[in-house]
Amino acid sequence: MTKYVFVTGGVVSSLGKGIAAASLAAILESRGLKVTLLKLDPYINVDPGTMSPFQHGEVFVTEDGAETDLDLGHYERFISTKMRKANNFTTGQIYESVIRKERRGDYLGKTVQVIPHITNEIQAFIERGAASATCGEPDVAIVEIGGTVGDIESLPFLEAARQMSLRLGRNSACFVHLTLVPFIATAGELKTKPTQHSVQKLREIGISPHVLLCRADRPIPDDESKKISLFSNVPEDAVISVWDVDSIYKIPQMLHDQGLDRLICEELRLDPQPADLRMWAALVEKLQNPKHEVTIGMVGKYVDLTESYKSLIEALRHASIHTSTKVNIEYINSEELETNGTASLAHLDAVLVPGGFGRRGTEGKIAAVRYAREAKVPYLGICLGMQLAVIEFARDVVGLKQANSTEFDPNTPERVVALITEWYDREGKVEKRTEDSDLGGTMRLGSQRCPIKPGTLAEAIYGKDVNERHRHRYEVNNRFVPQLEAGGLVISARTPSEDLPEMMELPSTMHPWFVGVQFHPEFTSTPRDGHPLFKSFVQAALACQQTRAGAKA
């Protein structure tokens, strides 16, 4: 039978519940347990797919094509279990499901209320999500409840968790509460009162946490831990200090050293093997002792909120680990390139243009593509970054001066990138969309396997085929591919059913390393293995740096 760990947060948001939950999962998995994680989001949106990156940060795409919270990316990076659509749900999905049942008459004319109907539906979603785990029936399901205790939006989820714990019985569920212990510089001390009040608020709704994770910018002294224990009614050994570190991959060891996994296993009556965190220690060792160093420019329009590129940043960090190369990421606002030109790119060892939507800043990104191509600097374009690379090549090499995407200019006569109106989903069913379709759920989403053209750089990186996740509406227009190929561009991978370009590159005679991909490889990168595309990209950046150094010498 699956046991449950509910992770809640207090005082403020963005304390790192996702990292804490993922780290606990990593420790439990290292002890031989099968673990899955779920994220419950209290907003009314059905999913984050149509939310602004400035509001929500990154949208993480699962293998089965769900647009989910970025915390699911952390989950996949920390444990071996893959996430699915069922691992993330929102208030919007819960209410949508309940209203649909009410319309069908499932409630037999009863008054539909938050309790019991909404809370029962939340419990059903939790148990369904745990049961659908890719690892088989999990020993432990860790359920992260989004938001902050005290928020009105989170109340139905907390009430559902309380009811579920009661229903499952003793030693079947436990609660971990993450809270803030701020340091007041003017007073020169840590303050525990916010934590005391947060736990009090949690207890008011019937939940007594078994463990407190106390976030601070420094380790919490024993006397402060004793005070927290006294006023929150949590045993002193269950008041765990979680301080700021320079790498999230240090967190599993930090939590294990303070006995978090022991406390959880004791409460849930689990007796697994001892934890083996040698892999995490080795990763941290490699991360902190690089042999080389490169600077990669990430050109985008969401650079003021790096959470928008969370998986991409982590993928570069994983490549850093596996190439013994420290990767410095320089965030470059593409709109500034439109105004000031590309001189600010001259010191970079490589250029990366990530995915994105909308017209704003695209000409600055195209300028960055042009710079990378002409200066022979390694270039990686992801999703929109590939489309813009094709547009730049069409304009500046092939001579299609009005080449553009219909996303930015619906009336362009040279539609090098356009909306595809019909395609096959992962199950082989035909999906259709138009310019007037809803934004939500009308993209090519999820994993797709594609064969790779022999003799290409793509084959050297991936092998015979590539299986990556997608999130896009627009595609490179096959009508212009013959002209692009005549100019030297290579389409190195295509979808097997629609024959749509999935990867493009420039031959070595034109550029040492220039690759565009329509998919999002960052979603499948893990610290354990890295990712072949990002490792190759970092190695190319290092080679570029060494070539420059040799030329100067």
From Swiss-Prot:
Q: Look up the record and report any one GO term of the cellular component aspect.
A: cytosol
Q: Name one GO molecular function term.
A: identical protein binding
Binding of L-glutamine, residues: 356, 384-387, 407, 473
What biological process terms from GO does the record include?
A: 'de novo' CTP biosynthetic process; pyrimidine nucleobase biosynthetic process
List ligand-binding residues for CTP: 13, 151-153, 191-196, 227
Q: Does the keyword Magnesium apply?
A: yes
Enzyme Commission number: 6.3.4.2
Any extra detail in the entry? Answer: CTPSs have evolved a hybrid strategy for distinguishing between UTP and CTP. The overlapping regions of the product feedback inhibitory and substrate sites recognize a common feature in both compounds, the triphosphate moiety. To differentiate isosteric substrate and product pyrimidine rings, an additional pocket far from the expected kinase/ligase catalytic site, specifically recognizes the cytosine and ribose portions of the product inhibitor.
Q: Know the name of this protein?
A: CTP synthase
Q: Give the species.
A: Burkholderia mallei (strain NCTC 10229)
Name of the gene this protein is made from: pyrG
